């Protein structure tokens, strides 16, 4: 009956499907998967097809469907897929589950805890990578999953949400342990900040290609599109695209005359130079705003850097309206931030590069006339990223480690953020790339070909240390 009611709707929105499912007391998710059998077009998130548990991929295999995939904003698929094929177990959450677990689970969970404590005793540093997930621990986890599966079959209702979350996390961990290979790392992170040692075990996917390639192969055709799919080898290697995949660079509908791109050549935003950069960046923002008042976005690599420049600007130029992105903004707060960018508005919105306002927002015309990008967007240098860099060098060559780990993901965020400025063929705007490294040939060749980047120098009180 639910299926018949749904099929009467020619355009089945999320809200309509949910109402039908609840009216018939069935799960909206499974109803949506069932209805895919009769749909010509299915619009969904990546995980419905690319995730290890994605039902659309399973239905494609089961029904031998001849499907076509259209993957929008495909530059995001690398990080999304890494998340799909990564599993974590946190010791603090595990101990909380032990305290509330039913009696049948006491012994299996104690076995896990015993092996976990041994791993902690063996680890001498805060972060360590291991060749593989330890067999004894994985076997204990598999036994616990089996016991918990039986328990949930016999008693499907009344179980604590913490127990159910552990069940799903443990199942994924076991599945990824079985599929473990060079595409992933097994690492243990130990946090002693709370006064007691708490560790996190992680099977961390870094190259999703082995998991994604079969899903691309199963499709009759697949088209990935994005404004930032360069360089091709980076995306082909990490996504597992077939060698014969054609790459088409579609000419931009925008012209260089629409977007005035300037790369600052005499200022560094490297961590060691940030205090020195605050006043020049604030002065640049104020000067551009005075020349052409309107709405601008200013992007920074962190909230700390953002707030430091914002403070400098407010102290020196309190007349300029400003608003800022804050940590953990909810949907209402995000919309309020965007609402400040009205066609009659004026001011500077401060945001973190790679966050909610760096892509996926549309502010055409006078709603946004410029952007300041004070960072290359490079991921933080830390033990995890350094391990990823080493693995990239082993898998794809020593000349690709830095690019695959740091440079390409960073510049992807830069180009996406700059892309907020020009949204229609009638728009005009300006982008300032604030860092001397934007003038390096290796960086320039990764920027959009339709940009005409001009080199500029800021007036400084003294020569910076570069």
What are these regions (language model features)?
Residues 1-466:
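ASCE RecA-like P-loop NTPase motor cores
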């Amino acid at each position: 009956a639910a299926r018949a009611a749904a099929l009467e709707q020619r355009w089945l929105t999320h809200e309509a499907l949910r109402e039908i499912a609840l009216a018939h007391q069935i799960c909206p998710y499974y109803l949506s998967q069932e209805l895919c059998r009769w749909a010509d077009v299915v619009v969904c998130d990546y995980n419905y097809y690319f995730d290890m548990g994605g039902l659309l991929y399973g239905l494609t295999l089961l029904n031998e469907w001849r499907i076509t995939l259209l993957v929008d904003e495909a530059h995001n698929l690398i990080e999304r897929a890494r998340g799909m094929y990564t599993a974590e177990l946190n010791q603090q959450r595990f101990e909380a589950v032990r305290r509330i677990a039913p009696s049948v689970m006491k012994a299996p969970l104690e076995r896990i805890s015993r092996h976990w404590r041994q791993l902690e005793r063996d680890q001498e540093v805060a972060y360590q990578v291991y060749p593989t997930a330890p067999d004894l621990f994985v076997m204990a986890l598999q036994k616990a999953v089996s016991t918990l599966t039986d328990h949930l079959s016999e008693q499907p209702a009344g179980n604590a949400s913490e127990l159910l979350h552990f069940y799903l996390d443990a199942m994924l961990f076991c599945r990824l342990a079985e599929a473990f290979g060079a595409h992933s790392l097994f690492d243990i992170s130990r946090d002693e900040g709370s006064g007691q040692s708490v560790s996190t075990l992680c099977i961390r996917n870094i190259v999703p290609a082995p998991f994604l390639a079969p899903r691309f192969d199963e499709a009759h055709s697949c088209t990935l599109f994005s404004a930032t799919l360069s360089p091709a080898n980076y995306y082909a290697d990490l996504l597992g695209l077939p060698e014969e995949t054609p790459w088409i660079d579609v000419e931009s509908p925008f012209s260089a005359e629409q977007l005035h791109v300037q790369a600052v050549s005499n200022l560094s935003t490297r961590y060691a130079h940030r205090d020195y950069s605050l006043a020049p960046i604030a002065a640049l923002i104020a000067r551009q705003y005075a020349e052409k008042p309107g709405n601008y976005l200013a992007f920074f690599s962190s909230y700390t850097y953002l707030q430091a420049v914002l403070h400098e600007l407010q102290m020196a130029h309190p007349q300029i309206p400003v608003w800022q992105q804050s940590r953990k903004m909810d949907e209402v707060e995000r919309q309020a931030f965007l609402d400040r960018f009205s066609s009659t508005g004026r001011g500077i919105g401060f945001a973190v590069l790679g966050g909610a306002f760096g892509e996926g927002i549309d502010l055409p015309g006078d709603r946004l006339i410029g952007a300041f990008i004070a960072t290359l967007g490079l991921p933080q240098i830390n033990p995890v990223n350094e391990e990823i860099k080493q693995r990239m060098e082993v898998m794809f060559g020593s000349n690709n480690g830095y690019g695959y780990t740091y440079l390409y993901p960073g510049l992807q965020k830069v180009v996406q953020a700059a892309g907020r400025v020009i949204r229609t063929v009638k728009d005009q705007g300006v982008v300032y790339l604030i860092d001397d490294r934007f003038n390096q040939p290796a960086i320039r060749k990764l920027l959009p070909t339709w940009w005409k980047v001009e080199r500029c120098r800021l007036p400084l009180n003294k020569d910076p240390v570069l």
